[in-house]
Swiss-Prot record:
Gene: thiM2
Protein name as annotated: Hydroxyethylthiazole kinase 2
Function: Catalyzes the phosphorylation of the hydroxyl group of 4-methyl-5-beta-hydroxyethylthiazole (THZ).
Swiss-Prot/TrEMBL keywords: ATP-binding, Kinase, Magnesium, Metal-binding, Nucleotide-binding, Thiamine biosynthesis, Transferase
EC number: 2.7.1.50
């Protein structure tokens, strides 16, 4: 694989995020730490332009509003027209009719480079579960076959996170086991990961490999952060520090990836 992290730091890809209030600051700081240049906006009046000029677009359904839903569709369609990869984080899909309708509209209208979600949300998209309760997955075991079903259904890469992370394009599948349970004890850790995928798909043409690289790098940063942190309060700044100090050599040294 290309030296993705070195290329991110060199190119400083512009990542347009339509995300939620809870995650916005944390995600922006994480993107800056890896070497990307983030924009965090959710007004429909800017969405088309940002979708055209970004190096990747991240659509996060966290604190959803009518305006945000409109902005996501505009940004996603503009990105598609300009060859810009789009990542979707369908938080709490199935939780409400409004949320599910917006997610369905995006899935029908926008060609996605990747879907990043927890195992419960992926199960909803696969039709295996009626609803997901949100960022905290109600499915503990991450089943590769469910992720593969969604990847094939939407012709995209699926990054399904859980105790073991699954990355698949429907044909190739990898199990990624880097990470730390402390990520479950801070808010917006999954949202940051979704944004984190953006720089990688902007510099790696094979989105499946980009997904593996992103989730593995993030997991390694979490592991190294917990060597210095004593709890969630000290973990957050330590995680940002370790993201900042990530290198391709460090990822190669610590990666735990098993391709099926």
């Amino acid at each position: 694989m290309v030296d993705a992290i070195a290329k991110i730091k060199q190119d400083k890809p512009f990542i347009f995020n339509i995300t939620n209030e809870v995650a916005s600051n944390f995600s922006a700081n994480g993107l800056i730490a890896i070497g990307a240049s983030p924009a965090m906006s959710h007004t429909p009046r800017e969405a088309k332009k940002y979708g055209e000029i970004a190096d990747a677009v991240v659509l996060n359904l966290g604190t959803l509003t009518e305006d945000r839903g409109e902005a996501m569709l505009k940004a996603g369609m503009a990105a598609n027209k300009n060859g810009v990869p789009v990542i979707l984080d369908p938080i709490a899909v199935g939780g409400t009719d409004f949320r599910t309708e917006i997610i369905d509209d995006i899935l029908k209208t926008v060609k996605l480079a990747a879907i990043r979600a927890n195992a419960g949300e992926i199960a909803v998209l696969a039709g295996k579960l009626e609803k997901a309760k949100g960022p905290d997955s109600i499915i503990q075991e991450n089943e590769p076959e469910i992720a593969k079903t969604v990847a094939k259904k939407y012709d995209t890469v699926v990054i399904s996170t859980g105790k073991v992370d699954v990355v698949t394009d429907g044909k190739r599948t990898a199990l990624c086991t880097n990470g730390h349970e402390m990520l479950q004890n801070i808010t917006a850790s999954g949202c940051l990961l979704s944004s984190f995928v953006g720089p990688f798909v902007s510099v790696v043409d094979d989105f499946y490999q980009a997904g593996i690289y992103a989730v593995t790098s993030y997991g390694i940063a979490a592991e190294l952060a917990m060597e210095k942190a004593s709890g969630p309060g000290t973990f957050i700044p330590a995680l940002l520090d370790e993201i900042y100090f990530l290198t391709d050599e460090k990822v190669e040294k610590y990666k735990q990836v098993h391709e099926l």
